[in-house]
């Protein structure tokens, strides 16, 4: 795990605070964010958070938000989550354009059947990942939505707008090192009005 990781012994107090603040609203708890579960230390951190929340809020559903285009999940996590979340992400490479239907197929073929969500198809007008020139437009995100749903994202899809996810503001710096090397987003005030949002509503 990278530096600035929450110490293992701080997880319990943090989770108690999360539970006290949110569990009364019956949320879905997303245990991780864009994680690749690359080593046992990472897995242990997230599993501890998951177990604590499961004991404190047994009626709240749980899942993990794994990094883009990742399909490999540790068995111990598969057995503990209530539904799968995958993200096809923001790559415009030809080899990645099939992810919207290949990833659900992988989940159905290799894991016990559970509800499935594409939690991060390409965001509208986000710059292509990998410092590639171009942006995803209304047609692209609509295609990603339909491919995901028809391929098995039975619990749904999410919509994202480049500029809203980062609350980008006029005149603010945006580092291409953030995420996968995305281009400067539009300010959130503009991104709120992207037309593709209506295709998802």
Task: Report the location of each language-model feature.
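Active-site mouth of glycoside hydrolases
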Residues: 1-83, 87-94
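Charged helix-capping and loop-helix junction motifs
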Residues: 11-12, 44-47, 99-102, 135-143
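Short amphipathic alpha-helical segments and helix-helix/interface helices
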Residues: 19, 50, 101-108, 145
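Solvent-exposed polar/charged
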Residues: 20, 55, 109-110, 150
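Structural recognition of the beta-strand scaffold that forms the well-ordered cores
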Residues: 27-31, 61-64, 82-86, 115-123, ...
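Active-site clefts of carbohydrate-active enzymes
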Residues: 35-36, 80-91, 103-143, 167-168
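Aromatic- and carboxylate-lined catalytic core of secreted/periplasmic carbohydrate-active enzymes
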Residues: 115, 124-126, 141-201
């Amino acid at each position: 795990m990278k530096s600035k990781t929450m110490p293992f012994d701080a997880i319990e107090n943090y989770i108690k605070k999360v539970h006290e603040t949110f569990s009364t609203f019956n949320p879905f708890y997303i245990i991780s964010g864009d994680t690749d579960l690359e080593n046992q230390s990472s897995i242990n951190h997230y599993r501890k958070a998951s177990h604590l929340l499961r004991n404190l809020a047994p009626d709240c559903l749980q899942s993990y938000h794994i990094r883009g285009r990742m399909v490999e999940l540790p068995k111990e996590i598969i057995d503990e989550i209530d539904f799968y979340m995958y993200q096809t992400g923001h790559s415009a490479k030809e080899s990645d354009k099939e992810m919207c239907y290949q990833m659900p197929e992988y989940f159905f073929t290799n894991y016990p059947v559970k509800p499935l969500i594409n939690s991060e198809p390409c965001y509208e007008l986000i710059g292509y990942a990998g410092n590639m020139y171009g942006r995803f437009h209304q047609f692209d995100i609509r295609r990603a939505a339909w491919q995901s749903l028809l391929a098995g994202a039975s619990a749904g899809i999410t919509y994202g707008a480049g500029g809203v996810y980062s609350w980008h503001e006029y005149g603010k710096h945006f580092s291409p090192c953030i995420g996968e090397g995305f281009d400067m987003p539009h300010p959130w005030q503009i991104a709120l009005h992207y037309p593709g949002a209506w295709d998802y509503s």
